[in-house]
């Protein structure tokens, strides 16, 4: 497989999942066509464009999916189009239909962004130069990451956050789409009424997006993570500069937040064992932090520095 052009399947533990996305035989080595099929259907469509369309067209729900038609797909809010792609959405259980992550934008942000791309490209040589810069930002923070990561199927969580930079770039094009609409009306010397209607339409887009996404992004009165970290820190001994060992992100971030932001128990030393195998983290732990001394590590830097 590694000798073929542009191999994308590399993890033998994911062989069954690869086959599910590429349509290959269960006990056969993947072909060039199957590699490209996997790249297009999973890595591009499912793990990038699906996230992109969540943000600018609409989202079915916030249930993590594995390709099934009822979980985590993009939708438009236009019934006949969504039903054509995913089946009759009215047949979904209420728990999915009323999911807070069910957000519909009717594709309006996408259309404005495409208009912005067209407007920028048609503004002469300078517009094309500006487009190339913005497109490079869009590509390198989106599709280039897809190419580099070469992800296996069955990721432990949705990965849309990895491509936020490209979504920001497209949001710039959305703004240009509004400018393009104004420029078009200015050139046609449109009357005040059409201009006003167009501005209301453009204003409707962010209002619709905010109204749809507010309930699933509202963090009001959510203190579980904060309280979790504070409780851990406050139960440690008051004296002696205690050390708390933790493992992984969810164990660690509530502790860091409480110390760094709310200044809770800054005499406690937090040690994340997931990082303990790295030279930079060992050095950090040897240094004092806030009111806590460094960890009593007797090695000097030459003994654990990578490459020495």
State each model region's role.
Residues 1-163, 170-241, 246, 252-308:
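ER/secretory pathway lumenal C-terminal domains and tails of membrane proteins involved
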């Amino acid at each position: 497989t590694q000798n073929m052009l542009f191999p994308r399947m590399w993890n033998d533990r994911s062989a069954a999942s690869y086959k599910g996305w590429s349509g290959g035989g269960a006990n056969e080595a993947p072909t060039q066509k199957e590699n490209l099929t996997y790249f297009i259907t999973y890595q591009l469509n499912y793990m990038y464009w699906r996230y992109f369309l969540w943000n600018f067209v609409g989202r079915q729900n916030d249930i993590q999916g594995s390709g099934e038609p009822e979980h985590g797909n993009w939708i438009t809010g236009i019934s006949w189009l969504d039903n054509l792609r995913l089946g009759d959405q009215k047949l979904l259980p209420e728990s999915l239909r009323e999911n807070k992550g069910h957000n519909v934008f009717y594709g309006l942000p996408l259309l404005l962004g495409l208009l912005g791309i067209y407007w920028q490209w048609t503004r002469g040589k300078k517009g094309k130069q500006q487009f190339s810069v913005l497109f490079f930002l869009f590509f390198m923070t989106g599709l280039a990451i897809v190419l580099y990561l070469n992800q296996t199927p069955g990721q432990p969580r949705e990965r849309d956050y990895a491509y936020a930079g490209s979504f920001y770039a497209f949001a710039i094009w959305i703004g240009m789409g509004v400018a393009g609409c104004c420029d078009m009306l200015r050139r046609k010397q449109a009357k005040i009424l059409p201009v006003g209607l167009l501005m209301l339409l453009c204003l409707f887009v962010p209002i619709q997006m905010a109204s749809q996404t507010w309930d699933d992004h509202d963090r009001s009165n959510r203190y579980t993570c904060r309280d979790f970290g504070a409780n851990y820190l406050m139960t440690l001994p008051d004296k002696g500069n205690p050390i708390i060992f933790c493992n992984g992100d969810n164990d660690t971030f509530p502790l860091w937040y409480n110390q760094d932001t709310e200044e809770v128990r800054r005499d406690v030393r937090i040690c994340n064992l997931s990082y303990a195998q790295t030279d930079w983290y060992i050095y950090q732990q040897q240094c004092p932090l806030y009111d806590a001394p460094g960890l009593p590590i007797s090695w000097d830097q030459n003994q654990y520095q990578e490459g020495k």
